[in-house]
Structures are given as C-alpha cells and as structure tokens.
Amino acid sequence: MKIIKRSGMEDTFDIKKIEAAIRKANESVIDYEKLTEEKIQEILANVEKACENMKRSPSVEEIQDMVENQIMNQRAFNVARNYITYRYKRALVRKSNSTDEQILSLLECTNEEVKQENSNKNPTVNSVQRDYMAGEVSKDITRRFLLDGDIVEAHEQGIIHFHDADYFAQHMHNCCLVNLEDMLQNGTVISETMIDRPKSFSTACNIATQAIAQIASSQYGGQSISLSHLAPFVDVSRQKFRKTVREELTATGIEPTEEMVNKIAEMRVKEEINRGVQMIQYQVITLMTTNGQAPFVTVFMYLDEVPEGQLRDDLAAVIEEVLHQRIQGVKNEKGVFITPAFPKLIYVLEEDNIREGSRYWYLTRLAAECTAKRMVPDYISEKIMKKLKQGNCYTCMGCRSFLTVYKDENDKFKFYGRFNQGVVTLNLVDVACSSGRDMNKFWELMDERLELCHRALMARHERLKGTPSDVAPILWQNGALARLKKGETIDKLLYGGYSTISLGYAGLCECTRYMKGVSHTDPDGTPFALEVMRHLNDACAKWKAEHNIDFSLYGTPLESTTYKFAKCLQKRFGIIPGVTDKNYITNSYHVHVTEEMSAFDKLKFESQFQELSPGGAISYVEVPNMQNNLDAVLSVMQYIYDNIMYAELNTKSDYCQECGYSGEIKIVNDKDGKLVWECPNCGNRDQNKMSVARRTCGYIGTQFWNQGRTQEIKERVLHL
C-alpha cells in the first residue's frame, strides 16, 4: 500500500511509523491514562484497515486524522491531546516555509500529485517544471495575501474550488475567442514585429499559429479560432497562382487558356491548403508556451459562418483537409501515427450537411470517420444553439466555456474578441452532505456557499480591474481581443456583458442521490436536480444585476479536482454508498459514469440541464470502436442535431510501443492496489512506452491522470 506525503511524494505505507508516534504520545502521560498494548494494536489494525478500504493512496494528513479519532474512541484523551499538540508544532514548522518541499519534490519528479495533475503536461520537462515552480509561488501568495481566509479555507476543504490559483498572482484572464479575422485582415503586432495582411493562405496559417502561441502565453485557459477567418486567404492564393501560372505558360511559349490556368491553379490551391492545414496541426502540437505545454486551442468549423459561393466552397475545402489530416494522425517518436490532443476540433451540424443527399453531407461523413478514429470533432447543433442563443451559433472558448449573447455599440452581435474572467466551482455534494438531508438546511447552506463563491468571483474580477493593456499587447492592443491604447486599462471590457465570469458546479448526480435517495435520472430525482440548476442561475442573475458583470453558470470539467473533492468529502463525511464511495465525483450535470443508459436517452436527458448551463457545458456518450460502423456514428450525430446543443463521442485510441498493439490499453490494479495502465497483449506497464488518449474534461488527455480520474475512466460504461 502507498501513501502520499505532504510534499506530494509517494511512499510505502509503514505501520511502524504510526505505532512510533502513538507510543511517543502514550509515554508522555501518567500510567493510569496510558493506552494498553492491546488498545494500541487495535488502533493500528483499525487505521490500517481504514486505509486499505479507501482503495487509493491516503495522505499523511488523512492517516493522522484517523489516528486521532481512534485514540479518542479509546477515551485516551490526554494521549490524543499530546498527539495533536505534536502534530500542531510540526505543522507550524512546515508553515514557516510552505513551498520549499513542494518545489523540490516537483523538480526531482517525485511529486505524484503534480505528475498526475494535468493530463496534457509532462512534469519531467524543464519548461513545465518552471511553470509549476511559478505556480507554487503564485498559490502561496494567493493563500497568504490575495484571498480572504474563509475563501482559502473553503478551497482547501473542497467546499469550493478556486480555479487556477497558480496564475492568480498575475493579472491574467481565463479563456477567449480569438478575433483572428481582425488580426489577419487589419494586421497585427507579434513580439514587437509588425505583421501585415498575409498574401497567401499558408502565410495566414503561419501567422495564426504564432498568434496562438503568444495568446496561450498571456492567459491560462483555452482559446478558439475559426477556419472561416482563414478561408478568405484561399482565394488570395488562388489569384496569385492564376497570375503566376499564366506568366509561366506564356514564358514557355504556351498560349494560356482559362481552362488551363484554372486547372493548374486549383491543383496548386489544393497543395497550398494541405500545407497550411499541416502547418497548423504540427505547429500547435510542437509549440511550447510559457506555461510549459502546447496551446489549448480549438478549431471551429462552421460552413454557414460565411456566405454561399466561392468563399463557402473554400471553407469546405479547408474543413475537408483538416479532417483528412486528423484521420491520419501524427507520428510519435517511433514513427507510428497516433491521436494528437490538439487542436481540438468542433464541427457544426446544420441543414446543409446533416442528411444524406445534402450539399455538404460528404464532410459530415468524413467527420464521423474522424470521430470514430480520433475522438474529434465534437459537435454543435446549429438548430438547437440558435434556439438557445437568440438566433446565434458560435464556438466555445477552448473546451466548453461559452460566452453569453452580447451586442456591441452598433447593435451587432459580437463573439470574437471576447473572454472569460475566471471560474470558481461549488461542490454540490458537500452542500448536500452538510445538510444532513434537511431540505431547509440544504437551501440555507446553498445560499451561504453561493455568497462565498460570489465573493471569490469578485476577487477574480478585482484582480483584473485596473490591468493595463501593456501586460499582453497581442491581446489588448493588437487585435486578438481588443485594440486598446498603450497604458489604457482593460476595465471597460470587464463590464456590460463584453466578458463573462463563471460560477461552476460539480456533483449534481451525487447531490441528488444524497438528498432524494435516487439518481437525478430517476423521475423522483430530476425535479430536485432541475430546481438546483435554476437556483444557481438565479444567483448569477442577481449578481449580474448588482455588478453589471455577466455572471454565468458553468458545468465544471473537473480533471484533477475530482479526486481532491472526493478525498475531502470522504474526510468530512466518511464513506456514504452512492455518494462518497468513489475517488471521483461526477462532472457538472452528467449522468454517473456507471449508470447504464443508451446514447440517445443520455443525450436527451442531459439536454435539459445543458440548457440551464449557459456559461458552458458539454455532454458525451461512451462508445466502442466504431470505425467499421460509421452509420451508427452518423445516427448519433443526427440525434445530436435534433436534440442537444453540444456533444461528443468518446472512444479509445491507444498504442503500445513495446509490442505494437493498437486498441484499448486497460486499467488494472497493481500489487499495492494502485490503478495502472497495462497493455493487454504484452503486459507492458511503462507509461513512457505507451500512447494513451482519453477524453477527460472536454479535451483529449495524453499524459495520464490521477487515481481519482483514472478510476472514473475505468468505470465508464458504454452507451452504444
């Protein structure tokens, strides 16, 4: 059995250390107050059994809590007092410098928690370690100086989650929709270098990737670009090719005809599109930003975003090439084509592409093939989104964070160039368990916790207020988000709906199960779950009216935090069957991963909750290998179009570098009960010698996960 030390390092469970600590406390009291040998052995046996029953590696703090409780259960109160006093003194010593051990353990790659914190960061790489070092300092400053004590305490107890504290010391926002059109059409500045309007499609793609890298280094969340902003440059290349082809033919003594010029020019256009798309794919996954990872970028593919005619045909050609290249994948260091994590792709389902025989059906079928093999694209229903977003269809910012509808000073809808200020998530399971199933107390606690979230969100807002545009010129001065003057603050962009700020929520499923005794999919549980969602939205509306800031409700994609919340719940409330008995809690409004349900029923059920998450949410269905059953994939896509705004299909895409096995690499328990990945063909368990891709929070993760998320992945049932 393993334990997690305070530094985050993993170590072997040693009952003798616990015994030594108990005996030391026991020796410091008078004889008649001492624990007997029999009672000491009973305490040790109970603690060891409790640790084994956790089915994960307990932390040192959790073990010490168990020891305290066991000593007090024996009514040896003076022994317990001495044990607690010693523990407190050690805590004071550690607090005097709270970051040293954490930083040293991540530099030496011995910190298990950091290793598994982010499934798209490799913690052994120097640039990632530098980011983690800076993050530890930021978290320390945030805890000690920037946040109120009760907010810090609530965060540490898992009552709320104050996201991205590792970046909070700086004046940075979360995620955005890049106004690539403005940057390309009107020129921009990157690293103090003027970039004019590009003269070809491939140059436009190159500028886009440079902008993506700079933007990723200036914020901590995801970003999205639209192919519709690149598509106009296909015709720029076309006209250039027509001119050069005519000149080349004339120079060789051939009288050029229009048919001849067009045919050769279109061949070159196709090659140009191939080059440009390949540049985006490879640049994005090979670029390293200042936060030590490839940019978290989403590419939006929406045909109706441009007018019919040549421009839409060019956009369709670009989309087709993106899908072809993603189906192929990218080569790993062994030269094997695998599934890349980025860019994430989103394809809009619309009347012109959703039915067989429609004009762009061939693209939708290609998208289905791509999803079956590479897990992307994800899908937005134009029909449903327009119903929910005042007739508009637009992409999320990165994974799932959606902007609210906003009109500019000219009364025109505006989405590109807007951003999110940050997120604070409420643990709904903790609200429920803290209420003891008393419904009046539940709503009272809910309002208390919401006010805590409100104050935490305003701390985020205040951290951005007064920020000069000079902190990130590409964002605020050079078109990615705005064209502010040097020295001008970003304040006007924080109000009036231009940007959003998000109240996240997690664990609606377990919250309902605790309060109502049934899943939120049960007819007896659904009304309560919907009432919770409406209550959260009402809070956002109230705060919006109070501050003139667009608060919106957001279905949080817990990645590593799911494990933290689960551990905190177990510590505070023990193991409650169906509620706290897993090492994860369910994301947002999702159906529990173990609940049997068809893909269509799941999407239909979750659609009503997605409508109540205007700040962002995504639904998914878990499917087997569908590469030989594209008709089934297409039927799910058509169901998405008719029933839900935003959804994705999860499949498996793994490769073992030891034996060449391609298929699903399994999750098994090792001798210490730890969940590990194992090739079913050769038994390889070396994570450095396998390529595993799983969807964990809207993005595809490729760097493995903590024990809580790994358990969740293992327990997912198929919906098709």
Where are these regions (language model features)?
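Charged, amphipathic alpha-helical regulatory modules used
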Residues: 1-110, 714-719
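Non-cofactor substrate-recognition interfaces
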Residues: 13-15, 417, 693
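Conformational switch/transducer regions in large eukaryotic molecular machines and scaffolds
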Residues: 14, 668, 696-699
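Conserved catalytic cores of very large enzyme subunits
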Residues: 89-497, 518, 522-685, 691
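Metallocofactor- and cofactor-centric catalytic cores in central/energy metabolism, strongly enriched
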Residues: 273-277, 281, 513-514, 709-715
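Contiguous, well-ordered alpha-helical segments that form the cores/surfaces of helical PPI scaffolds
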Residues: 501-514, 534, 695
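Long insertion/accessory domains within large nucleic-acid-processing enzymes
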Residues: 681-720
